[in-house]
Amino acid sequence: MPWRTALKVALAAGEAVTKALTRAVRDEIRQTQQAAARHAAATGQSPSETKENANANAKLGISLEESLQILNVKTPLNREDVEKHYEHLFAINDKAKGGTFYLQSKVYRAKERIDEELSRLEQKSEENKEQQKENSKE
């Protein structure tokens, strides 16, 4: 008899935990979707652009915002400015001049992330030009 009662209590506790966990996961998914929608609205990006940025951030391990801060460049990205800032920061953080490999790698990763963004923007502008040509032909 005591085993039966203990089994009922254990089953009830397991059921309650399962329901609570299911509810928590469902709430977390809903909140994540809402946060993604708010982020897209705040940045003015489409969901696909947001996903592309997230993929690039994950692939390179650094966000675009952090990269811009490290290299001290502003958002109308200019390849020449990025290259100039990169070369300067990479040179002054040389180990022979008292810098560290860690700082050099941060500068390198920042430039790599900005280059990825510039490539993506160039590809997007080329696609827009092609689309405009097709629309003008019709």
Swiss-Prot record:
Low complexity bias locations: 32-43
UniProt keywords, alphabetically: Membrane, Mitochondrion, Mitochondrion inner membrane, Protein transport, Translocation, Transport
Entry's Gene Ontology cellular component terms: TIM23 mitochondrial import inner membrane translocase complex
Signal sequence bounds: none
InterPro entries: J_dom_sf (IPR036869), Tim16 (IPR005341)
A matching Pfam family: Pam16
Keyword Mitochondrion: yes
Membrane topology term: Peripheral membrane protein
Superkingdom assignment: Eukaryota
Biological processes, Gene Ontology terms: protein import into mitochondrial matrix
Subcellular location: Mitochondrion inner membrane
Region of interest called Disordered, as start-end residue ranges on this chain: 32-58, 118-138
Segments forming a coiled coil: none
Record field: compositional bias (Polar residues): 44-56
Span list, region J-like: 66-119
Free-text note on domains in this protein's UniProt record: The J-like region, although related to the J domain does not have co-chaperone activity.
Family: Belongs to the TIM16/PAM16 family.
Known role: Regulates ATP-dependent protein translocation into the mitochondrial matrix.
Subunit description: Probable component of the PAM complex at least composed of a mitochondrial HSP70 protein, GrpE, tim-44, tim-16 and tim-14. Associates with the TIM23 complex.
The name this protein goes by in its record: Mitochondrial import inner membrane translocase subunit tim-16
Organism: Caenorhabditis briggsae
Lineage: Eukaryota, Metazoa, Ecdysozoa, Nematoda, Chromadorea
